[in-house]
Amino acid sequence: MAVWRSCLRASSSRHRLSSLFFSHHLKPSSFISHSPPLFSPSPSPSPTCFSPLHRLLSSGPEFPIGSQEIIPTDDSSLPVLAVVDFLEGFHEFTGLPWWMIIASSTVAVRLALLPLLILQLKKLKTISELLPKLPMPIPETPTLKGSIDQFSHFLKESRAIGCPSFLWFFPYLSVQLPCFFLLMASIRKMSLDGHPGFDSGGVLWFQNLSDLPGGSFGPVFPILIATFHYINIQISFDTSTIRQTTGLTGLLMRYYKLYLEILSVPLFFVGYAIPQGSLVYWVTNSSVNIFQQLSLKHPTVGAKLGLLSQGATPGMGHSMEISESVIKYVDSDSKEQTLSLQTLTPEELLSLSVQVLSKGDKETSIQLLRLALEKDPGYVRGLVLMGQALLQKTQLSEATEYLELAISKLLDEDPSDAEDVELLMLASQWAGAAYVQQGKLKSGIIHLERVAKLREPGDPKSKEHYFEALLLLSSALYKEGQSDEAAKILRVVVDHNPAYKPLLEQCEDENELVSDLVSRRKDHF
């Protein structure tokens, strides 16, 4: 008991001395800028007289801790503190106001990440050029084993032709997102902690960077955040790309774009709950993103950086306007040129049509093809491409007319070179597909059997077209009740791509069932 009393007396005397020291030497304002941590450490249960070293370390050299003796802690992570120190040093070095420090630091970070973005875009350009030469990564009728085999075959073929790794879709995003949130967290900490100079570091309506948006100009930042987000979505998901993407992928893209557009509404309200210092950073980052996207999409910039696809000219492929019989485009010197469509050859018109069709503009593509065929009605490549364009628009009857005409011309000339054989294969495949879609299975089978009689091509892309035609032929034969013939064709397809083995098994099982029924009827009679 005597020991405990002496400890308590010592603690009480120290309490009075420390209180006297703080009342004379420390102003109340010195505690305002140091807000307590959200989760304070629990006080030690041991008496203070048993921990003199702890008190010495916790008090610090200049500001001894008072009666509560709580160790000052900072719940911020080391990266956040490092960014805060860097921004403070940049501010002291330049003497610029804080809003300019935040904005310029944002621009500097985005410029530092730009080389990585350009490298990623170049890799993705190479992937997009090689992807049409590769087989599908997932079979049309996926099963676990079939999907694994098909994907392994896809990876093997991609390595064989030198296709970059598909991990190149992620590097920029995996670096940019952490940088965005790190800067956001650092500036938010400075705003909430009342960092020196933040109370007068703004300009115009946002003088105090630590305050939340308010007053008559309060909606400005939230509106800018929501608007810039919406604009970024429209630039990223351009309408022609979404229109061109069909099937499940196109549907998912459309719904994902809609989801991101709807996010603009909650982002507007989120803007009211963020300090104005953080809002300066967010708005600057969004505006830089808009400028960066528009710049990289510009044909001249794309050509300088080597981001344009091979064979695509900046003017004709990316910045082009067609009105009546005139085409306006930007040439390699970034000068706007006007050209009459009547002066172009059928080959040039077809090249333009292919580029327009790749953007999803089927109407303009068909318009150019009609003009090319007016100049040369026997232009076989133009006839085949016209049939394909009309087939995409589901104008099946007109598509078959052009494809039949192309096939007859090719057969009359007895195609021997590789280009004519490929045209015959494509025209026959698309004509067969058009007839099958119209329910004219017999007419479709005639054209598809013509493809089956051709020699298997060596080019990977042509080979995929060849086996797609065989698969379509087996489907038509199966629907016509010729399951034996369908199974023969499917065996050839499965030898090329094992992912279609379940279809073959289904076809063979039905053949066995039919044979069993026939034998039973013979036994009955």
From Swiss-Prot:
InterPro entries: TPR-like_helical_dom_sf, YidC/ALB3/OXA1/COX18. Keywords: Chloroplast, Membrane, Plastid, Repeat, Thylakoid, TPR repeat, Transit peptide, Transmembrane, Transmembrane helix. It is a multi-pass membrane protein. The keyword Calcium does not apply. The chain crosses the membrane at residues 99-119, 167-187, 217-237, 262-282. It is found in: Plastid, Chloroplast thylakoid membrane. One of its GO terms (molecular function) is membrane insertase activity. GO terms for biological process: mitochondrial cytochrome c oxidase assembly. Belongs to the OXA1/ALB3/YidC (TC 2.A.9.2) family. Probably required for the insertion of integral membrane proteins into the chloroplast thylakoid membranes. This is ALBINO3-like protein 2, chloroplastic. The lineage of its organism: Eukaryota, Viridiplantae, Streptophyta, Embryophyta, Tracheophyta. The gene is ALB3L2.
